[in-house]
């Protein structure tokens, strides 16, 4: 690991540090943050403790919210991502508490005054995938590709993984007459929507950034010819153009579909979610709540009935952590 620019020997100069999406912070990252804050500075942490817990050890944000006697804790009450009459908002809040948002699974259910939360239940995984792909193609015509996402629990090695869906959408969307690059089953072409999956400090591009391949060309590298490709990343206030070599292709992944973990912290006008029993070990209220709240305007939940019920009935959010050891010991002693 490269480490961090700031630490206890070279602290941040800011008097107030504000961190968003704190439910994603694991123990290692939190330790690095507090080590880099100068004495006397204030730390403000914002987040939703009912979303997915962080990748890695610990449940820092959830644990800190239990320390009501020593920390100042405020609860935000106004939702800005969805409208007040949104079915996305009302159903997400029910799911957050493990409450069924519908009477029973049916072929098609639309909830909310805005009719923005749609459920479609099928018994076959292929049927779910076909609806997702058809719905995606229709949605990008309305909202544009940057504002539409298919999100699923798992990356690969199962039905309806991001790998499977990305390959199918790439085959539909892109012209394969030009140069292509391939890693395993994934094929990259000019126009491919891609996500950076590792931090690359030298290129100043980071995990989770999404862009499009704009050029693939053959270049002379000494006595050998190799392929280079260019990706354009559009941020809210800037555009980054990054060139990669063929050997750096594993830093990218196709990004028409992504895992729910990867989508955390992002929002899209239209979100299409697929839940089936191949993902059964991951299915719980946190996963489904996180997925639904990625949607700003429209959410389509495609599910096997049993998988949906498993999400509502199951909660995996609680972790046994060292931060709460003192409280647990005191509770047992009393």
Regions found by a protein language model. Name each.
Residues 10, 203-210:
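Short coil-to-beta-strand transition motifs
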Residues 46-195, 200-203, 220, 332-334:
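Conserved helicase motor core of P-loop NTPases
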Residues 1-35, 78-79:
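Conserved P-loop NTPase motor core of helicases/translocases
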Residues 14-25, 49-50, 263, 268, ...:
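Conserved Walker B
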Residues 17, 44-45, 150, 273:
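Hydrophobic positions in the central parallel beta-sheet of the AAA+
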Residues 13-16, 40-44, 298-300:
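Loop/turn-to-beta-strand initiation segments
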Residues 97, 207-334:
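C-terminal accessory regions
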Residues 21-33, 49-59, 283:
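Conserved ATPase-coupling elements of RecA-like P-loop NTPase cores
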